[in-house]
């Protein structure tokens, strides 16, 4: 059992299940407004697995299937950008592989993976720059105008 209370098998099964659920969500035309780990509630089901619930859905939208769009890619960046102590790079790759399913090794998905890595690194750098420039104490100072 790891620091998060899950065995390696449980963690891998949970990542597989979450990837499948996110894929189904996207296949149905939904794009979450803020799909970050803190907006995913995980609860143990009656068996071995976990059930996942997406929270903070005020900006979640469903788009018609005939409308070509790539907004779902933003959800992958949102999920990937937060460093999580118990989620390794290999875990992230397992998630991506399961998300892509049988089409994992296609050229389009290899391009998507490179795009995702670039976007994630850029977004993390932007967030780190904000954190470095602005301390909590400074944020709390009232700015008179």
Model-based region annotation:
Residues 1-33, 38:
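Conserved kinase catalytic-core helix
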Residues 39-54:
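Conserved protein kinase catalytic/activation segment
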Residues 50-119:
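C-lobe/activation-segment region of protein kinase-like
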Residues 121-145:
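Conserved NTP-binding catalytic cores of kinases and kinase-like/nucleotidyltransferase enzymes
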